Design a protein with these regions (language model features):
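Phosphate/nucleotide-binding beta-alpha loop and adjacent structural elements of enzyme active sites
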Residues: 1-125
Length: 125
């Protein structure tokens, strides 16, 4: 089943400020007035068994994964995570995945579509 929650996913439950200019210029800011409710995966889905997480959080992948670390440790879901927003994510994201689930096999995938810069990690047990 697919369930839609009108929330941002973050490392904790919080209120986040975003620019609402649209397109690629939408970004997390600290001084704007456009407030979005955020929640961590562990709180949002604490009574659920998560089996798959697909995430393109526009550069907030690490923070969002940190908010789901208990779900990831407990259920070892398949992960499909964007890897191209920050150069360091190529190294830091798989290290974090292995810290949570050492038996994850992590693959770097480049899909043949535009935009050409999109890289994703696939992690499976």
């Amino acid at each position: 089943d697919i369930i839609i929650f009108e929330r941002a996913i973050w490392k904790e439950t919080a209120e986040l400020s975003f620019s609402d200019s649209g397109g690629r210029q939408s970004t997390l800011l600290t001084g704007q007035r456009h407030i979005v409710q955020a929640v961590d995966i562990d709180t949002l889905l604490e009574d659920e068994r998560v089996t798959y997480i697909k995430m393109d959080a526009e550069g907030a992948e690490m923070e969002a994964l940190k908010g789901g670390k208990e779900q990831i440790k407990r259920n070892k879901p398949k992960l499909f995570i964007a890897a191209y927003h920050h150069d360091a994510d190529i190294f830091l994201l798989p290290l974090f995945m292995w810290q949570l689930v050492p038996e994850y096999k992590v693959y770097l995938r480049k899909h043949p579509y535009v935009p050409a810069w999109e890289l994703n990690f696939l992690a499976v047990v």
